[in-house]
């Protein structure tokens, strides 16, 4: 384009001219100017690196802002109403654009927000208010996944412009995320419910390097023909020459890159022509070592150093060298060489950059971040190895195309050079890949198919897809559909298939994936398989970015599993399946698993339970490696295995967190605890029983942790009490290191206490538990949030009864929750545990245990607590039988009973056999027995049954119940006791030990027992009468303590009632219908405890003495039960 046709910045409205520092746009920008600024059509631009494509983004942003300019020419900004989303393949590019656009647009009130892994401080409100969102594909996809349940996707409807930088990323495995989010935006924009929103008319603009199939991308993005712009190498300001050199592979990627250092000097001497050069290395250490190698080589030439051209240059280097704080860098600068990475301080980085721009330093060895950030062009660019170490994946990976193009774009300095040189050093087998890459001959294909099921699940979870029709429509919005029609063989479609059948194949593929998801209960479908709804496993797989195979493995896990089994699940995960067992690693792993020092928590065992002598599989390697790493002091120092271990910990922690939430959903108590502990351990790279727990604190590494361990400081509590000066002496550090270490304790969550107790036992055997959290220390003023999971579960049932996630700084102390728990019926006991498990830190979790005994007919509640035991002495022979309803195990409801008889609560045999569980009694029910309380209580009971006359079972048929009252033996007939003594003669019971034994032996056939008719007028009993009767029954029944009947004996009556004598040590009698044979279960006493009325009538006994006296009697009654003695009095209380 001629210069007279170049567009001027003055063609923009006056409000926007300050956005550009130049007067004219270049030829590429001028040609795209009308479409970018004066229209809203979608566009795709293919142009070489460095041709000025970024300005096109800014023109489209200004076009969007121009809609907010009033007729008067003022800029009226509505915060967040019209959003721009900028998507870049790298965080470095995002941060570069963020700095640039903040500087340009901030004065207009435009807010920019970075959404990358480096920025986790944003909130939903920040996203809602942002005008420009700068993000990477993976992060934008993850943000939309995480916030779907909290309504965090509301900003989608405000998206008006989407800018896609380096769209050729689609050809990279990472391109699946980019394809998924663009397809999501496309299908949402076609949603009828959003037809009135900004998203319905969203504009898409994509730029890329030179690619051969730009038309396919245009079809996917719905770009009209006018919006397709293709520019060749003529648009590049400096012509580039590319050379690709292949080298033989080494044993591992690390050694291969290190070996390439030997070739760099010769390459620079041959191709740089004495001009400036950038050497891109994959790691900081690699950049430093490359600079060291070049400086040492140049030093051998003395005054003939090829990197120093003049004496003046040498003098400037000598002056600058002492200004560098890095001692090693000082020696490199003197040779005309430097290195640049994130490990340098800002002062040293600025010094190196200035020396390079001035031409004093000829060579800089740097990491790939310099390719995206500071503009330091050079004549020659050397890319030392095409692989870099990916921290997220934990292993070496090939550079993506955009990164390589960015590095190559640094070659050539427009003001000084008219040519540039790019040297790529790679392995021999990958030479052809990079030749096609730089020449623009590589066709961009879709990478969505290998992870289609995961992205399909994500759309169902986000409700983008609600039925089969919508699912097929979403797939048609993908780049996969476009390339399937153009190149079906590349996507597992038979060669030669008609193009019209591609759509049918796509539908079959969609149905296949949905059936798989439904089979594993990740989604729900109706009977017709049409409606699609997400299930919790599918939500979790989407939330934690897990592979489908990994989630299947978690779902198929046995119900009950331990911590080591949880670690085995992680080792089988698809996310770390790329880690392989190398031959040279087997000996080291075998030695680690042998564990002669007893360092490891778990080992690989054979079928006999012994430690395996040989590690044979990839999963076994991962398991051993993880155990060695989690000791806190690993014995494996091999770089390759160290990288593998880091990958296990980073990916494993995410997988374990997903397992935790899945088992909470399944209410699996043991699985939840194991997964939670494993997730924290992998995150901290420590087991919870490690002696180096202090490594969790900032500023404490392994050396400091070992030093503290040697002085006995092994816990957070011990560190809080330690002397700062002694810490400095032991660690060999200077003041105020000790104070700093102690201050790091402020990063821990506030200290709390947990308590669990049983507060009530309701009907149907339901226990009410109270779990209380109390904050012991006040939370410190900190921006860090601490969360913990409160879990209440039972071990025997492996069941979670309650779960809540709590923010430790915010809950109101004390915080109490009520948990209803069904008492055990089949098991003899249930161990209830309340656990407060912190999300991040290990070694500070809280656990509390409560023991619940099996529910019995009398519904006595047991609990373990720090309360003195209180016992209800058992009744001797009082029972109530119900003709209509069977006796249930639930507690009796006093309101449903008539007041004509007292309620007698019997204690089960198990209640006095256990030492730890106690019978619960509310404090208000505890009564001190004295003269007044005993007689008052008897009078109250006497009101309910004014006469203890015999009941005629035939006289009240309407009631449907017959009640058997207690019968005893009598020796002498006192006139005032006749109404009581007549009960003894009803069944003709014996009155002494000898007669009792004979009666027991002679009853061999059913007999009859009937109640006598009432023959005299009812009259109430006096207090003295009752106690005399009790006293005589106590003295006249010693034989009952030793009698024992081996088998129960049934006594039949003419009224159709049966009485059964229990074989237990206590005699009792029960009357019920013939179809119900009751059993008397009271225990017979082994020792008679007599009671005299004078004990109660002592008026001079003090309150304290009375308390002690009653406690003594209650204690004796635990081991010695009387038949009709003191315990009968207690049964009324």
Swiss-Prot record:
The UniProt annotation places ATP binding at 47-54
Which GO MF terms are attached to this record? ATP binding; ATP hydrolysis activity; DNA binding; DNA helicase activity; RNA helicase activity; rRNA binding
One GO biological process from the UniProt record?
chiasma assembly
Name of the featured protein: ATP-dependent DNA helicase homolog MER3
Summary of the function given for this chain in its UniProt record: DNA helicase required for crossover formation, complete synapsis of homologous chromosomes and bivalent formation during meiosis. Is specific to recombination events resulting in interference-sensitive crossovers (class I meiotic crossover).
**Gene3D superfamilies given in the database record:** 5' to 3' exonuclease, C-terminal subdomain (1.10.150.20), P-loop containing nucleotide triphosphate hydrolases (3.40.50.300), Sec63 N-terminal domain-like domain (1.10.3380.10), Winged helix-like DNA-binding domain superfamily/Winged helix DNA-binding domain (1.10.10.10)
Matching InterPro entries: DEAD/DEAH_box_helicase_dom, Helicase_ATP-bd, Helicase_C-like, Meiotic_Crossover_Helicase, P-loop_NTPase, Sec63-dom, WH-like_DNA-bd_sf
The knockout outcome noted for this protein's gene is:
Low levels of fertility due to a significant decrease of meiotic crossovers.
Name its cellular compartments.
Answer: Nucleus
Q: Which residues form the SEC63 domain?
A: 536-847
| UniProt keywords, alphabetically | ATP-binding, DNA-binding, Helicase, Hydrolase, Isomerase, Meiosis, Nucleotide-binding, Nucleus, RNA-binding, rRNA-binding
> Where does tissue-level expression of this protein occur?
Expressed in meiocytes during meiosis.
Q: Which reaction does this chain catalyze?
A: Couples ATP hydrolysis with the unwinding of duplex DNA by translocating in the 3'-5' direction; ATP + H2O = ADP + phosphate + H(+)
Give the gene name.
MER3
| Family note | Belongs to the helicase family. SKI2 subfamily.
Q: Which organism is it from?
A: Arabidopsis thaliana (Mouse-ear cress)
Against SUPFAM superfamilies, the record matches this protein to:
P-loop containing nucleoside triphosphate hydrolases, Sec63 N-terminal domain-like
